[in-house]
């Protein structure tokens, strides 16, 4: 697969011109709006000066007008600043989507990206890790990729539960000597898992489910909130690799088959992935060779929302870091299914 060096060489030769042209188009929209806002603020100032001239003899009225216009001027300035700031973030986001798709195009000519699409809940539920009977599921940034006739997909996932909260509003009526209490009920979202779901196939077929759960029993918060919502089945398997046992708890109904699947080679590959990105990962190996990987606190959305300083120009370092993260996702398939 092409690497960062290849991409930066492509950037210097061709892509810089293509990206700059796209950024310039968005810049024009931003500066057009900026000019309108500046003109609007100048008009407020002119009206402000004219009113002072017209009502200058009446000091009380003048001071009142000055005060009101100062409030209006400050309010519109604040609103316009917020609008511009939001537009800058939106432009940064749009540019990042362009970069994301261009990097995918550079790495493969066969991919599908849909920003507001999630993996079908039925397919997600088939991996049998999180209990969707008691969890709410949301997703976005669905991406399907085909490299060297190997297909895989990934998307952002949010799994959460809700609990009812009560907010009290108290009012004391002195005339009747009565304390009125009003209860407002609302649902509070409690995130259980937020990260990336990655699904692929490996050549090494498995005869039963095998689950790798990150060893978090020293973390009371995770133990309390995550494990209650995991629905995996099987018995805990102790592998001969002590270091791997310290990182992951292995569950399966078939100890012999799980040991066959989790060979030293496969464990080394999983360790290699952990070195590339240290985020906690949950692995599900299915009977048909499908593998589901849940990467905690790693999302495409966070990558797309990262500020890219587009007004001064997108730097090579920024593009290189962006490429590394996308390349990592595409390399998961390459590493795990490496012969």
Q: What do these predicted ranges mean?
A:
Residues 1-35:
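Cytosolic juxtamembrane N-terminal segments of multi-pass membrane proteins
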Residues 6-12, 87-108, 112:
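Membrane-interface amphipathic/juxtamembrane segments adjacent to transmembrane helices
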Residues 31, 74-99:
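Transmembrane-cytosolic junction motif
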Residues 31-47:
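Transmembrane alpha-helical segments and their cytosolic interface motifs
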Residues 45, 49-57, 75-82:
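Short hydrophobic alpha-helical membrane-anchoring segments
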Residues 53-72:
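Hydrophobic alpha-helical transmembrane segments
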Residues 101, 105-108, 117-161, 186-339:
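Charged, low-complexity intrinsically disordered regions
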Residues 162-188:
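Mixed-charge, low-complexity intrinsically disordered segments
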């Amino acid at each position: 697969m092409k690497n960062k060096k290849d991409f930066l060489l492509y950037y210097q030769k061709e892509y810089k011109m293509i990206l700059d042209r796209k950024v310039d188009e968005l810049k024009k929209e931003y500066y057009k709006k900026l000019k309108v806002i500046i003109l609007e603020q100048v008009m407020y100032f002119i009206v402000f000066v004219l009113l002072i001239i017209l009502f200058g003899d009446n000091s009380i009225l003048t001071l009142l007008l000055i005060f009101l216009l100062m409030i209006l001027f400050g309010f519109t300035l604040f609103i316009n600043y917020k609008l511009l700031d939001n537009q800058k973030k939106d432009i940064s986001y749009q540019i990042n989507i362009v970069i994301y798709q261009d990097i995918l195009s550079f790495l493969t000519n066969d991919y599908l990206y849909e920003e507001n699409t999630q993996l079908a809940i039925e397919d997600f539920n088939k991996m049998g890790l999180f209990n969707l009977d008691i969890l709410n599921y949301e997703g976005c940034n669905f991406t399907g990729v085909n490299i060297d006739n190997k297909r895989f997909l990934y998307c952002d996932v949010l799994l959460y539960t809700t609990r009812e909260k009560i907010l009290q509003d108290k009012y004391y009526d002195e005339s009747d000597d009565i304390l009125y209490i009003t209860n407002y009920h609302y649902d509070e979202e409690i995130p259980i898992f937020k990260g990336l779901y990655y699904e692929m196939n490996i050549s090494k077929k498995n005869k039963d489910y095998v689950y790798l759960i990150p060893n978090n029993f020293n973390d009371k918060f995770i133990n309390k909130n995550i494990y209650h919502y995991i629905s995996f089945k099987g018995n805990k398997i102790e592998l001969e690799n002590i270091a791997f046992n310290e990182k992951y708890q292995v569950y399966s109904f078939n100890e012999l088959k799980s040991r066959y699947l989790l060979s030293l080679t496969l464990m080394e590959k999983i360790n290699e992935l952990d070195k590339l990105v240290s985020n906690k990962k949950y692995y599900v190996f299915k009977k048909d060779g499908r593998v589901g990987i849940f990467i905690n606190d790693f999302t495409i959305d966070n990558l797309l929302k990262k500020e890219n300083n587009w007004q001064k120009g997108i730097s090579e370092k920024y593009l290189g870091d962006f490429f590394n993260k996308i390349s990592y996702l595409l390399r998961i398939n390459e590493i795990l299914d490496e012969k």
